[in-house]
Amino acid sequence: MGYAGGTKKNPTYYSLGNHTETIQIDYDPARISYAQLLDIFWKSHQPDRKSWSRQYMAAVFYHTDEQKQRALQTRDREAKRLQTKIQTEIIPVTPFYLAEAYHQKYYLRQVPELVKEYAARYPELNAFIGSTAVSRVNGYIGGHGSLESLQKEIAGLGLSPAGSRRLTEIVQALDKNSRYAAQGGAYCPVPF
């Protein structure tokens, strides 16, 4: 989690300037394509909803003309599918500034016993936020995954038996009410 899209150097949550809260995705194009990431992105938010502030606006930040064109094509496809104007911005990337530590992995931070396990394994902030397992668990706690998908990968998430049980309890409760579960899973699939 961090800030991008603005001109202020070294923004913080309380001194954001004209930046937007966003994430930076580092990916291996041999495993998942930019087009696939865009498809996940469009399914994972409401692109026709106008944001009430620049801080929280939905945006695609592109690095190349090719990425820009692909983002515009998929935006137009979504506008046609939804039969409405798309409010999601498509803008050139600016420097990405990592947000403060307490903003990282927000959903996971709501479950102290799981944070404690991962903090012991990843004591450095960059290792903690860069961990695939930490990111996956944060997503599950945020309601972005089904109990079925968790059960398939829980052994590889690096949790103790107690941590695994706690995560399973959380996902069981969320799975019953999750809009993502009801839609068949508009969350990032496990890369194989």
Feature annotation, model-predicted:
Residues 1-192:
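Flexible coil/turn and secondary-structure edge motifs
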